[in-house]
Amino acid sequence: MTQIGILGGGPAGLLMAVLLAKRGHGVQVFERRADPRLATADAGRSINLALAARGIRALREAGVMTALQDHLVPMRGRQLHNSDGSELFAAYSQHDDESIFSVSRSLLTRELTQVATRTAGVSLHFNHACTGLAADGTPLLHDALQRSLPVPQLSRWIAADGAGSAVRHALQARGVLQAQEQYIEHDYKELDIPAGSPLVREALHIWPRGGFMLIALPNADGSFTATLFLARDGAVSFAALQTDEAVQQFFAREFADVAGLIPALAAQFAAHPQSRLGSVYAAPWHLDEQLLLIGDAAHAMVPFHGQGMNCAFEDCRILDELLADGQPGPFARFSTQRKPDADAIVQMALENHAEMSDSVRSARFNLQRELALQLQRRHPQHFVPRYSMVTFRDDIGYATALNRGRVQQQLLDEMTLPAHDGSLPTAASLDWAHWDAQVTARLTPL
């Protein structure tokens, strides 16, 4: 079978290695960091990950879900914390068996490393950083001291080296692909909430404040990882929070119910890094059939839909199938077939930022959400809320979810047009026979 090299030993690279090795390929993984089983996680370095249907399907096909099960915490919906201190729980789905799962990136990486180590045909090489490409397209590898390392002669290379991909930058520099990195005006910073807090455990907590927000995801040990999303500059921004006093006052004013749950708040705020958020658009993702980008290296996205990891894991599953089907040009086919779905989820992730930070506070938004669930109950084969298509339906491509979501949103906008006095209709006041007909006329069955 083929000898394949994978650049990047994060979750996507490790899953890709396991999938390929199970088909009989020899796989070598090169990771710039030290073995995660020997290292401690850097505080505040990574947003907790949300595992959903697409990622779960890929993990199951690789046979690794059992190893991860104890590290997953189900999140059944959003727990909204309003400025007035009130709270509202909004379930993600009307189906009890549909949840997303919170998982620590460091724990996930360690478990996948263990699985890969035990998988026949996989070799892991730590402290091996890909810093670029040679003239013939093979990677350049260096250790932590920037010393050159030998590069094996392998049939194919897969780059899963993240949003800042050295491989993507090298391909862009030689004109093989076009790429753009688009950063948003908001950065993020993580804070730790220890176990024992009164926060509801099986929920994704959101403190929506319009131009900014705080979220918190549960961990398996009972703690929460909170993340503040805030503008870099301006009157309300990270730039305005340069003193302990400013930080304390900001949290007391905006997040009074959680400020006391974060020990040494000002010290954590000062110690944890402030990181940027952005999207990557690139095409094509391959260099002949020699080299291919997957995951964040090809299509990094902002974290507001919780799909970055799920999309990357779906990449792994689809690429594995293309490599196994015996047809020519699997890298080119992957690049062509997967691009529309990747572009769609990158866009939807950006759109979800506005929803999470602001729209969830709107009466019209919440009415539309109620109506969407009613339409789904009335027309389960025609109307599936966009969030559910993205999160729980791995049989529906991202591009399909985006396009159907636009039609559905137009319907909901029409159903909730305010009256002249600004009042909204109620569900009971709607002409349901009319709207039932509109659903079946505008949406084909799934």
Locate each region found by the language model.
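Helix-loop-beta segment of a Rossmann-like dinucleotide-binding subdomain
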Residues: 86-103, 229, 233
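C-terminal helical "tail/cap" subdomain of flavin- and related membrane-associated enzymes
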Residues: 321-446
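Conserved FAD-binding catalytic core of PHBH/FMO-like flavoproteins
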Residues: 114, 128-132, 137-277, 281-287
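Glycine-rich FAD cofactor-binding loop and adjacent beta-loop-alpha segment at the N-terminus
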Residues: 2-77, 83, 96, 100-107, ...
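Helical element adjacent to the flavin cofactor pocket in flavoenzyme catalytic cores
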Residues: 103-125
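Short, glycine/acidic-enriched loop or turn micro-motifs at the edges of active sites
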Residues: 34, 164, 299
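Acidic/histidine metal-binding catalytic segments
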Residues: 70-74, 123, 253-270, 327-333, ...
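Conserved mid-domain beta->alpha element of the FAD-binding
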Residues: 9-22, 158, 191, 273-361, ...
